[in-house]
């Protein structure tokens, strides 16, 4: 199954709490999963990435189930279709209240996800989620992923009781 992820998911994968990271690691470890990273989302991630972010990206790039998907000619055509539909419906921003530049980048991310056959787009961006849903693309958030057993079961490190005798 192919899953597209956006910039905020990438950021959470590197900087999130242990539960968030465990959920995403478990998703990626599943044998039938291919993660699609649209290049506009990757660029947004890299703007704020530090050395840890770059190291993480380098470690992921060599994996066959981690696909960086370009905004190429075919994606541009898909994106143009999305915008043309919005314009036909009377609002080039598709009803979004976001800045025009954000709407354009969101469309690029969505076009890439659709073009590469993503089953769903994982995002915490409400605007992108609404736009994707309106175009027939299912969206999910990280908390929709199951929590791995390895982080559910924790050992309590208790000190032995003091001997007060």
Which ranges hold each PLM region?
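Short, well-structured N-terminal submotif of metal-dependent ribonuclease cores
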Residues: 1-37, 46-63, 150-165
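Acidic, PIN/NYN-like endoribonuclease modules and their adjacent C-terminal/linker elements
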Residues: 110-165
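General small-molecule cofactor/ligand-binding pocket signal
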Residues: 36, 67-69, 140-143
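Short beta-strand scaffold positions
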Residues: 5, 37, 70, 104, ...
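Short basic/aromatic active-site micro-motif
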Residues: 100-108
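Short, hinge-like loop/turn segments at secondary-structure boundaries
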Residues: 52-56, 86-87, 139-141
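Alpha-helix capping/helix-boundary segments
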Residues: 9, 41, 75, 108-109, ...
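Acidic catalytic patch
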Residues: 67-100
